[in-house]
């Protein structure tokens, strides 16, 4: 293996990791998208949540998404109507790119973090 003076930090200097995104594809707020920039994002009918879903089918504190490296998982917080991932009711589940999340009347799609090359002009 040839040696090189280029290190991993050097290679990553021109790369930005975008935050994962949760997009509403069905429900009262269709078209809205939320960047999951925090380590933990709460979802619910209470406006204090990171993702506020204003509908009576959503519990005040319904679920939370926990970022883990480049991925994430969702946990139900004891909601009345449950949290569904890819058609199955879950207490907790990993999220993958394209995962469908149903919370009340809302259907949301999870989009993973992605590395993005930053143009340096060199």
Regions found by a protein language model. Give the residues of each.
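Forkhead-associated
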Residues: 30-107
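Short Asp/Glu-rich motifs
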Residues: 102, 113, 120
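Intrinsically disordered, low-complexity acidic Ser/Thr-rich regulatory segments
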Residues: 1-54, 66, 116-122
